Amino acid sequence: MKILLSPLFAIITTLTLTWLTLLNPTLLQSIDLRISDQLIVKEKEFVEDVVLVDISEKTLEVHGQYPLPRDIYGDLILRLRQANAGVIVFNLSFPEEDRTGQDEGFTLMLPNGVILSHFPSNKAQNRSAYSTAIVQVGGDALDYIYNYPGIAANLEKYENAATGIGIANTLPEIDGVVRRLPMIAGVQDKLYPSIVLEIFKAYT
């Protein structure tokens, strides 16, 4: 105990931490994040009313290469509705016309509970995505969030038909782990809601 309270120990500890910070500026922050992870770890809760539908290797073997024809997605929407799905979310974007000519049928399936995603990009693009109205109070939110120069938007007819469209992006911490999801994102000086926020709006 005397050693821990001695001035020499304090000086050595301070110099060591300073040296480690200079050697690797993100090291202490990474350690702090790992400690926080251990403090908030709790038993996993299983949610039965959320279902994930994945595009598997077997699906690609049956229906061909990705992207799948839009009528397959339309049939999936129909089956999910028959199973009383409240909100249907696509964690992928549809920026191009369907190669099999199924755009019209897919568009008709998008109203009433279908949420599409679009993905921000660091590559500048000419076309802007559909923008959901966001009311700002107390300053410009773009001063505090990352403003992407481009976005991988869906076809305009899809975005006009869908119940909602949200940004699907993640911001990993310095150790590469995703712990938080932004509720809004800036793209080409406009604000876009996250996919999580759009799901919440549609569900409530």
Spell out what each predicted region is.
Residues 2-204:
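Non-transmembrane functional regions of envelope-associated proteins
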